[in-house]
From Swiss-Prot:
This is Pyridoxine 5'-phosphate synthase. The record marks 156 as: Transition state stabilizer. InterPro entries: Aldolase_TIM (IPR013785), PyrdxlP_synth_PdxJ (IPR004569), Pyridoxine-5'_phos_synth (IPR036130). Its EC number is 2.6.99.2. It is found in: Cytoplasm. GO terms for molecular function: pyridoxine 5'-phosphate synthase activity. 1-deoxy-D-xylulose 5-phosphate binds at residues 14-15, 50, 55, 105. Pfam families: PdxJ. It comes from Alcanivorax borkumensis (strain ATCC 700651 / DSM 11573 / NCIMB 13689 / SK2). It catalyses: 3-amino-2-oxopropyl phosphate + 1-deoxy-D-xylulose 5-phosphate = pyridoxine 5'-phosphate + phosphate + 2 H2O + H(+). One of its GO terms (biological process) is pyridoxine biosynthetic process. The gene is pdxJ.
Amino acid sequence: MSFMSRVLLGVNIDHIATLRQARGTRYPEPVQAALVAEQAGADGITVHLREDRRHINDRDVELLAQTLQTRMNLEMAATEEMVVIACRIQPPHCCLVPEKREELTTEGGLDVVGNKAWIAQCCQRLGQAGIEVSLFIDAEESQILAARECGAPAIEIHTGGYADAQTIDQQQQELARIRSAVAFALAQGLIVNAGHGLHYHNTLAIAEIPGINELNIGHSIIARAAITGLDEAVRSMRSLLDTV
């Protein structure tokens, strides 16, 4: 694979902060984890600043913005508070995601069709701040078209249905749906990323989809890091993507 066509790896470090918050300690330090991930081959670092600050907090985001050698992708809800924070910190990338306080993790894609006016306004304000905006959406043509109409240059396809499939047939159906959505989005001129629920045994099929720009992967890497160490966990995922 040529370097120019390689699938980028965004490492989500939210669960480093989850471990810290479990005891209310100062450790482990998300910034330290981010730097290790970068050195191990991550192309970027993803963090989700949730409205309830259940893991990543404002201080983490500010320090990461000052210290990362690659780039930060800030996941956030499409709220006034988060848009103001992002415009102040100015990360290179923002991904607008749906958010519910009661959920354990993001449960589905953003409903761009049903909230087009507000999301378009968010995209405009973030874009004017020099931030490349992506929208985390399900693999549906209507949502892809709405994302383009909102002025978002990129989307992130929600791969949760594929990752959570209970049978091989169901998984293959979800994979076909994602492939079709990626091709459709590329035809609309969008940058296409993907993520959610990806791990060492299901990522390759997504990475092999033509036109995929970046995969954002977190929980599985941090889970493996608890056993093997973060450097090895990131290198293993990077090596997996490099086989494409």
